[in-house]
Amino acid sequence: MRRPIIAGNWKMHNTTEEARDLVTLLRPLVGTARAEVVVCPPFTAIAATVNAASGSNISVGAQDLFWEDKGAYTGEVSGPMLRDLGCRYVIIGHSERRQYFGETDATVNKKLLAAYRNELLPIVCVGETLAEREAGHTLEVVGRQVREGLKGLETGQARDLVVAYEPVWAIGTGKTATAADAQEVIAFIRKTLGEMYGETAAAIRIQYGGSVKPENIAELMAQPDIDGALVGGASLDAVSFAAIVNYDQ
């Protein structure tokens, strides 16, 4: 039985004080959640978020990391630094990183291996653009992103992996893939993982991301292969995020 995982990606929002306030509001609202709860603040607010979440059932993740552990890489943040701050998870390959910062399947793969090297649990994002979907290339694109992004990952490591399917055309647009559309692609991702990792694929958690809201979470979570959500805007409001986390209550 795969435990559901709901992760909030705060993106470039929340100062340290705002992060502290949000987690303080969130703690009592999600304290009895069956799902695993993760929040991913910007780098500058990680320490404050970890402190505010201490002793609760809220884990903290980062939104990115660099693939080297140290060196002359101005502006970058490494796996050891994230571990030192108390991070448990790290998002890798988010569509905004691919769109604005030139992230590729190859850099996603290097970052994935860096995460495992530093005992961080990766949330690896995959998904097609609107043009790719309209051309009928969704499964081809997503399959390639999965295979290339996870290259070199051993079966024993894959059990702890989280994959997030986030169709690029549904990020921040208010558009959501239907639950059936999301299930179709996520079932394909699980099939691809099965070709790579055999029976272990049944244990890998796969999230949906893309305009997830309290209004659509239950229908998404009712699908057999959807194990959680990567939540953007709705995670910035404690009540909305808690409603998503507590979708089954």
Curated annotation (Swiss-Prot):
One of its GO terms (molecular function) is triose-phosphate isomerase activity. SUPFAM superfamilies: Triosephosphate isomerase (TIM). It comes from the Bacteria. GO terms for biological process: gluconeogenesis; glyceraldehyde-3-phosphate biosynthetic process; glycerol catabolic process; glycolytic process. Its EC number is 5.3.1.1. One of its GO terms (cellular component) is cytosol. It is found in: Cytoplasm. CDD domains: TIM. Substrate binds at residues 9-11, 172, 211, 232-233. PROSITE patterns: TIM_1, TIM_2. It is an enzyme of class 5 (isomerase). InterPro entries: Aldolase_TIM, TIM_sf, TrioseP_Isoase_bac/euk, Triosephosphate_isomerase, Triosephosphate_isomerase_AS. The active site is at residues 94, 166. Pfam families: TIM. Pathway: Carbohydrate biosynthesis; gluconeogenesis; Carbohydrate degradation; glycolysis; D-glyceraldehyde 3-phosphate from glycerone phosphate: step 1/1. Keywords: Cytoplasm, Gluconeogenesis, Glycolysis, Isomerase. It catalyses: D-glyceraldehyde 3-phosphate = dihydroxyacetone phosphate. Involved in the gluconeogenesis. Catalyzes stereospecifically the conversion of dihydroxyacetone phosphate (DHAP) to D-glyceraldehyde-3-phosphate (G3P). Belongs to the triosephosphate isomerase family. Homodimer. NCBIfam families: tim. This is Triosephosphate isomerase. It comes from Moorella thermoacetica (strain ATCC 39073 / JCM 9320). The gene is tpiA.
